[in-house]
Amino acid sequence: MIPGQYQIQPGDIELNAGRRTLSLTVANSGDRPIQVGSHFHFFETNDALTFDRAASRGMRLNIPAGTAVRFEPGQSREVELVDLAGLRKVYGFAGRVMGEL
């Protein structure tokens, strides 16, 4: 093995397999771009984003870890959300939950 070498098994990795997903239309009603990271509790995003907020409780963007989605002012786009996993306790973010979902 060469130092730093990767040994990757053949095949594909399916992200978030078996988790519930939801598609929502999200619009940026503000005057500045808004970027939302992969593991941000979508329910608690910037209030300038308009969407069915109640439906997004306990969910995050269904995108690879470390990536984000950017919403330009006036832009509307469809996003896919996925259920948060683990203990399903949410602390921090905008402070709208601060406990169990």
UniProtKB/Swiss-Prot annotation:
<comment type="similarity">
    <text>Belongs to the urease beta subunit family.</text>
</comment>
<dbReference type="InterPro" id="IPR050069">
    <property type="entry name" value="Urease_subunit"/>
</dbReference>
<comment type="subunit">
    <text>Heterotrimer of UreA (gamma), UreB (beta) and UreC (alpha) subunits. Three heterotrimers associate to form the active enzyme.</text>
</comment>
<dbReference type="GO" id="GO:0043419">
    <property type="term" value="P:urea catabolic process"/>
</dbReference>
<keyword id="KW-0963">Cytoplasm</keyword>
<dbReference type="InterPro" id="IPR002019">
    <property type="entry name" value="Urease_beta-like"/>
</dbReference>
<comment type="pathway">
    <text>Nitrogen metabolism; urea degradation; CO(2) and NH(3) from urea (urease route): step 1/1.</text>
</comment>
<dbReference type="GO" id="GO:0035550">
    <property type="term" value="C:urease complex"/>
</dbReference>
<keyword id="KW-0378">Hydrolase</keyword>
<dbReference type="InterPro" id="IPR036461">
    <property type="entry name" value="Urease_betasu_sf"/>
</dbReference>
<dbReference type="Pfam" id="PF00699">
    <property type="entry name" value="Urease_beta"/>
</dbReference>
<protein>
    <recommendedName>
        <fullName>Urease subunit beta</fullName>
        <ecNumber>3.5.1.5</ecNumber>
    </recommendedName>
</protein>
<dbReference type="GO" id="GO:0009039">
    <property type="term" value="F:urease activity"/>
</dbReference>
